[in-house]
Curated annotation (Swiss-Prot):
The chain crosses the membrane at residues 259-279. The keyword Zinc applies. Belongs to the RBR family. RNF144 subfamily. One of its GO terms (cellular component) is cytoplasm. The gene is RNF144B. A zinc finger (IBR-type) spans 102-167. It is a single-pass membrane protein. This is E3 ubiquitin-protein ligase RNF144B. A zinc finger (RING-type) spans 31-81, 194-223. Pathway: Protein modification; protein ubiquitination.
Amino acid sequence: MGSVGRLHCLTMTAAENPTPGDLALVPLVTCKLCLCEQSLDKMTTLQECRCIFCTACLKQYMQLAIREGCGSPITCPDMVCLNHGTLQEAEIACLVPVDQFQLYQRLKFEREVHLDPCRTWCPVADCQTVCPVATSDPGQPVLVECPSCHLKFCSCCKDAWHAEVSCRDSQPGILPTEHGTLFGTETDAPIKQCPVCRVYIERNEGCAQMMCKNCKHTFCWYCLQNLDNDIFLRHYDRGPCRNKLGHSRASVMWNRTQVVGILVGLGIIALVTSPLLLLASPCIICCVCKSCRGKKKKHDPSTT
């Protein structure tokens, strides 16, 4: 198996190692990641889109994508890739260490379960069992029983099963089980669910403005209010979450100053470029009209 895996890795490279007499004839290719010129024996071509990068950069990119991607498909690192290529598992296994590839497979499986409406995870922290979910109407809660710990919970909110109460009206709290304790949405709970995708998030310390790594939703840790559009962090100036951001007043003011500076800079750029666009617009319109007129004459049969 070791020799087969090594043979597969070698076939992924763009060329074989050149002989010493052919070094002067070896072409150099520019890597789109590090912008350095490398010989073909140090490059790797992706199978799906045929984009080529140096092997060292591709290894670093894959390891970073595995750690930050939560099991999502690893796409071609070229932002303007015309084929929108995706790396195959054989390529990933060839270029990253074994433990990194095992982590990728585990995260990929967890993501598949999360996106599958017929499967869900047991909410008990140390159970980690995949439970089957009966088919139902979209958004309709279904009773789910874990085959391992036999916990009965709701398929939508993952709280204890509430037959006569909706998920919104149910009171989430501590779920005692023989395996441990699952925290709900109390203010001091260390584990809460994302208000959008319901993924469990643990907060140890630091800022109270949270961003879900799964759906990128930004919310307040204490009251779960939506903060996607609160760029000035005004939520923590009033109400029950006043002064609970977790940062000093000076750092908050500095953050607001930076945001204002960025907005003012964009406004200045717009003001400076708008007269130039107005002056250049007649030339642009003339060029477009000339091009359209030329195409019309080309396709007009009376001119032939």
